[in-house]
């Protein structure tokens, strides 16, 4: 309510999460004697109890209908979706440059919502905006003379059926400092039986898994510089805390190593509403960092290539 001002202004996908938790399909399983066993969507006990009318806790009263019962609660119960590190992806506004519709869509499309809603785990979630997903360097083309940049975008057409995530692919030119300049659009990128839908799903799954860090509950990001490994196996360096955190990905580190100007190559958290500590929401499952430069991307060189380069330097 504080964010959207009016109930009618809250997006449907947020309201649905609340209804999924509070609407139960079995009356028999939700009678007062079974309150202690009623689960939420994360399969954790909701904590229902019998209270007093006008009290501070528990279910104060009920209304009988011809097809069920309405329980009137004296307190607000936790909703896993609102405590999850994935929840900031649902908090969109009217500025398309700050939207995270693509990641919200792919989280649901690939059934990662339940995984990210787990309250038994702690996560660090590096969430790229739709703007960041316009700058994806395809790792399949790293070794080619002609690298490519993919621009993912959300198709808002009302009459659209099927996937709403589309993409455009561009040839790119590699600059002296290792950065890429976007060139002409590739007019027919789908060959050998591949399709746009398959490509989008494959690459966005890779992006999603490299955005998720499963955090040891005893660990913290407040201990200065630390190295983490994403669910997709990508090492990431985090420095600083909260909204001031600096994120160094393998792709960014490689650019820094190629550039002698010592320019900062970290991914920075978005200045406005770029950091969410979901652990304070309350009892949430981690921290979310929103970035609008690019998603987490791997380096272009393999371990064996790096070892060969080191050996060459040592022999000079």
Question: Predicted regions: what is each one?
Answer:
Residues 1-316:
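Mature, structured domains of secreted/extracytosolic soluble proteins
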């Amino acid at each position: 309510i504080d964010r959207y001002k009016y109930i009618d202004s809250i997006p449907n996908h947020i309201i649905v999460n609340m209804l999924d938790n509070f609407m139960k399909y079995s009356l028999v399983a939700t009678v007062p004697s079974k309150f202690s066993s009623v689960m939420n969507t994360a399969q954790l006990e909701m904590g229902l109890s019998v209270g007093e009318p006008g009290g501070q806790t528990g279910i104060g009263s009920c209304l009988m209908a011809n097809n069920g019962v309405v329980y009137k609660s004296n307190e607000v119960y936790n909703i896993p979706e609102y405590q999850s590190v994935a929840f900031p992806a649902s908090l969109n506004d009217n500025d398309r440059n700050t939207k995270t519709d693509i990641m919200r869509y792919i989280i649901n499309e690939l059934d990662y919502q339940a995984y990210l809603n787990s309250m038994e785990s702690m996560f660090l979630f590096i969430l790229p905006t739709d703007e960041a997903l316009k700058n994806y360097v395809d790792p399949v083309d790293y070794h080619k003379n002609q690298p490519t940049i993919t621009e993912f975008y959300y198709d808002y057409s009302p009459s659209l059926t099927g996937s709403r995530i589309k993409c455009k692919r561009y040839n790119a030119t590699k600059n002296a400092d290792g950065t890429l300049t976007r060139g002409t659009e590739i007019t027919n990128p789908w060959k050998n039986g591949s399709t746009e839908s398959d490509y989008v799903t494959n690459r966005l799954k890779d992006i999603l898994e490299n955005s998720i860090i499963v955090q040891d509950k005893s660990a913290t990001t407040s201990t200065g510089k630390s190295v983490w490994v994403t669910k997709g196996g990508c090492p990431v360096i985090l420095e600083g805390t909260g909204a001031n955190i600096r994120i160094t990905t393998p792709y960014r580190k490689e650019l820094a190593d190629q550039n002698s100007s010592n320019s900062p190559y970290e991914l920075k958290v978005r200045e406005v509403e770029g950091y969410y500590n979901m652990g304070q929401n309350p009892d949430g499952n981690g921290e979310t960092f929103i970035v609008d430069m690019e998603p987490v991307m791997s380096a272009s060189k393999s371990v064996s290539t790096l070892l060969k380069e080191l050996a060459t330097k040592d022999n000079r």
